[in-house]
Amino acid sequence: MVRPADSSVDAQRAREQFLSAGALQPDAVAPSVLNSWQRSRELQVHPDRVDLPYLRDPDTDTPLMHAAAPVLRRIAEDLSDQAVSVVLTSADGLVLDRIAADTEFERILDDVRLARGYSYAEEFAGTNGIGTALETGQPAFIRGSEHYVGTLGGLACAGSPIREPVTRRILGVVDLTCWARQADPLLFVLAKSAGSQIEDRLRTMNNETETALLDAYLKQSRRYPGGVLAIGGDVVLMNRYLRQALDAADQTVLLDHAAELTRSSFTSTTVAQLPSGASVKISAAERIMVGVRGDSVVLHVSVHVAESIPVRGSQHIPRLAGRSSSFRRSAHQVERCYRDREWVVIEGEKGSGRTHLGYSVARFVTPEKTIPVLRIGDFETPESFVAAFDSETDDADFAVIVADVDELPDEVLHPLAAVMQTRAGRGWIAATTSAERDSQLVDMLMLPFFIHTVTVPALRHRIEDLHELVPMLLNELSRGEARMDAEAMRQLAKLPWPGNIAQLRHVLTETLRRQRSGVIGADKLPSECRSVTRRKLTRLEAMERDAIVRSLLENDGNKAEAAEALGMSRATIYRKIKDFGIA
């Protein structure tokens, strides 16, 4: 059944009235259409021309694409004698795929940018079957002049959201577009059916992946005598060895590190320090690939239980904040190495306080000694660095820290190793390094001299230590004149701290520029503290995030007013708030 001509005329009149008067009589158009027109006007979409940005090249290797491909092909074949296009988009309206048999109709779609890489979100294209379905979360059938943009008035589009079967999160939209004069309610029915078919395929693929993950887990459990861990989506499998060897706190930290390794396509092994003091080596044993690119992995976990070290709770090492069991154990391991004059590698993420830990422990045990810290960046030439090391280790009872040995240039390593060879068996050297170093020369020339390795936990893995770290750093930076209130401390505890203590010091320094004394509230924290995204932002993204946070603060949290002040649409600011994790 083709839509009657008079209803098309009514929609055209209603659109013209809305654009001129900004209001309509009740029932002039469907409420969903009117609401979308109002959103389009607020988003400042141009009503007379298509002005769409090319966002990015579509990613064709996703579960959504793999699930949708056969459904789209089948529908396109069934409609091959019709001027109908089958379109798949992402959750932000980006056109991922488009199939149309009619070449003339394809040219029309190219003219209105209904093509791969362009976005048909409402913020760009106004009212349409794709953007309106995404905005409302419901199927949408937009015909002729119901489109907000006049250029699209010759088309009709039926869009149906596609949801992830478990979480029900919207993954994208399947859309059928045809000439407005040929619009048929059956097109809407077909679009909704296509959406359901794609969701069914996603559900089947999830089940296949979970089955494959279970099979791989059981296979690795039979072959590997140690810990076996499987992670995929919402599924976590842990063998009895790990459940018995690790308590709940250790298991939580293990899963955190394992999840990070699972998401990485470059790293296959990592080492982690657990709250109990045990360390684990986590290695990817098998990645599950069942027709899609996924993050399902079976891991081997080797557990190394630390020797029992008495933790003397009454002893406090000055300028060394942190009462978490993992950090205290690291400190006491370094202390034991220093007292026994055994060389030690202190490894951990950059900014985690590796050098500070070694220096503070050495000064605590021997306050009368000077503990030199050698950094290659403090010297004009590699030769002067090696000469300084030679001089500082010349006496029989020397103590020295070499910072960031994994960053030493190759021309330093050979002469430095030669000097170390002559110092073996006396004095004390601590060398700091990243746990994920990739320098084979460092492993070959440097590490054999060191008896022990102590891992300093990342700040995000000992977040409870903020209660000591923040007051200590504030006291140092403000001379005791400032402190954080409870709300500010709660906000700091939410952050992932990829830059560790170095980032915390920077944050507190920036905060004190806003308020130098007294009780500091969360509103005085810098912009990066309002963002809880785990990925590292580019410099441009960080500037954009800061501008949004400032505008939100200046407009008392009103997103619409903040967007207007920044000259961006409301939909854009909502999307960026979500992307940047602005709290």
Swiss-Prot record:
InterPro entries the record matches = GAF, GAF-like_dom_sf, Homeodomain-like_sf, HTH_Fis, P-loop_NTPase, Sigma_54_int
Question: What biological function has been recorded for the protein in this entry?
Answer: Acts as a transcriptional activator of the mimABCD operon encoding the propane 2-monooxygenase complex.
Which GO terms label this protein's molecular function in UniProt?
ATP binding; sequence-specific DNA binding
Q: Which UniProt keywords apply?
A: Activator, ATP-binding, DNA-binding, Nucleotide-binding, Transcription, Transcription regulation
In which organism is this protein found?
Mycolicibacterium goodii (Mycobacterium goodii)
Residues that hold ATP according to the record: 348-355, 395-404
| Descriptive protein name | Propane 2-monooxygenase operon transcriptional activator MimR
Query: Which Pfam families does this chain map to?
Result: GAF, HTH_8
Q: Superkingdom of the source?
A: Bacteria
Domain named Sigma-54 factor interaction: which ranges?
Answer: 320-513
* Gene Ontology biological-process annotations: regulation of DNA-templated transcription
Q: Does the keyword GTP-binding apply?
A: no
